[in-house]
Amino acid sequence: MNSIEFSLLDRTTPNSFISTTSNDLSNWSRLSSLWPLLYGTSCCFIEFASLIGSRFDFDRYGLVPRSSPRQADLILTAGTVTMKMAPSLVRLYEQMPEPKYVIAMGACTITGGMFSTDSYSTVRGVDKLIPVDVYLPGCPPKPEAVIDAITKLRKKISREIYEDRIRLQRENRSFTFTTNHKFRVVCSTNTGNYDQGLLYQPPSTSEIPPETFFKYKSSVSSPEFIN
């Protein structure tokens, strides 16, 4: 194999130094070593599991899955979240050290999905429980979309300031963690009784006046045969 030469990297200077800030150095180290806590409850998590294989290889982004929230700085929620699971999810998020991030993966996590229409126990969006940094829609999203969400989170980490993030999280804490939902009583959609005004009803022949019927009938010319 041919060797690749990098002239800029091979060039050495006796008095070389790197100029940066502590905040940029902290952001660079955190975006290259995200340790996710996998919170999968539905089929969307299977798409994330495919990232472990050699085809996508999520290890190149520095992702190291952890089973303990105290060792993770990223929680990835995938699947439906119910009212009974909400306190445990909030507890896991609170046990994660700062700074911490959240990726909401799939329609069921973001809006409740198809279960949000007639289910009394489904949380209508995980952002009502914990603050979400990246929304990843799809049912389910592809592995390429998961990689794109991780890339966007890395860009967000590289531009943020740690003190401002902590301040915003403390301000949003009062209204973020809630399980109260406003339900509206509506008729069931599975009764089979539909609004007759919305259905198309063709006019019957008895409603057409006889003179109108014979008028259009006489206007049609009979076919002519030519020998």
Swiss-Prot record:
PROSITE patterns per UniProt: COMPLEX1_20K
EC number: 7.1.1.-
Keywords, comma-separated and alphabetical: 4Fe-4S, Chloroplast, Iron, Iron-sulfur, Membrane, Metal-binding, NAD, NADP, Plastid, Plastoquinone, Quinone, Thylakoid, Translocase, Transport
Membrane topology: Peripheral membrane protein
Main location: plastid
Necessary cofactors: [4Fe-4S] cluster
Keyword Plastid tagged: yes
Gene3D superfamilies: 3.40.50.12280
Catalytic activity as recorded in UniProt: a plastoquinone + NADH + (n+1) H(+)(in) = a plastoquinol + NAD(+) + n H(+)(out); a plastoquinone + NADPH + (n+1) H(+)(in) = a plastoquinol + NADP(+) + n H(+)(out)
Cofactor: record remark: Binds 1 [4Fe-4S] cluster.
Pfam families: Oxidored_q6
GO cellular component: chloroplast thylakoid membrane
GO MF term list: 4 iron, 4 sulfur cluster binding; iron ion binding; NADH dehydrogenase (ubiquinone) activity; quinone binding
Assembly information from the UniProt record: NDH is composed of at least 16 different subunits, 5 of which are encoded in the nucleus.
Family indicated by similarity: Belongs to the complex I 20 kDa subunit family.
Protein name per UniProt: NAD(P)H-quinone oxidoreductase subunit K, chloroplastic
Organism: Citrus sinensis (Sweet orange)
Gene expressing this chain: ndhK
